[in-house]
A protein has these predicted regions:
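Glycine-rich anion-binding loops and their surrounding alpha/beta cores
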Residues: 1-144
Length: 144
C-alpha cells in the first residue's frame, strides 16, 4: 500500500494490525510519493506475522540510477496507457526503472526473490520477453 507521507507508515501498519491484517507492505518515496522513488530514499514498513519492521532503501540497492520526478511523471489516462505499453514493449527509460524498482520490492517482500537486484532481473525479464505485454493484451481482449 502506498502512503504519501512517510511519517504515517508505522501508524497505518498499527491500524492494519489492530484490524486483523496478518501481512501488509507499506511504502513511501522521497518527494511525497505513494510508491518507491527513484529520486532518493524510500521507506518500507512491513507487517508480517504480527511484527512491524521498517527499512530505508535507495535506487542503487536495486542496481538502478536515480531520476528526477519530472522524468517519471505520467499524465492523463490515455498518456499513461501509452507509457505502460511502451514499457511493456521493452522501452528503456526512467519510467521503466520506476516499474522495475517497485516490482522488485514486491517480489522481495513477498518472498519470491531474495534480493532487490534479483527482483529487478526477474521483472526486467518479464518486460523484455513479452510476458507482460502478452498479459496486457489478454486483459484487453477480456475487457468489456
Amino acid at each position: 500500500m502506498g502512503v504519501y507521507d512517510g511519517s504515517l507508515l508505522e501508524k497505518t501498519a498499527e491500524v492494519l494490525k489492530r484490524k486483523g491484517r496478518k501481512e501488509a507492505f507499506l511504502v513511501s518515496g522521497e518527494g511525497g510519493l505513494d510508491e518507491l522513488s527513484l529520486q532518493g530514499e524510500s521507506r518500507i514498513v512491513a507487517l508480517k506475522n504480527g511484527e512491524i519492521t521498517s527499512m530505508t532503501v535507495i535506487p542503487e540497492q536495486f542496481g538502478l540510477k536515480r531520476a528526477d520526478l519530472s522524468e517519471v511523471r505520467g499524465g492523463p489516462p490515455e498518456e499513461n496507457a501509452k507509457i505502460l505499453e511502451a514499457i511493456f514493449s521493452g522501452e528503456k527509460s526512467p519510467k521503466r526503472d520506476l516499474v522495475l524498482l517497485n516490482a522488485s520490492a514486491a517480489l522481495v517482500l513477498t518472498g519470491r526473490e531474495n534480493s532487490f537486484q534479483d527482483g529487478v532481473k526477474l521483472a526486467g525479464k518479464a518486460l523484455d520477453n513479452g510476458t507482460t505485454l502478452d498479459l496486457l493484451n489478454r486483459m484487453r481482449k477480456q475487457a468489456p
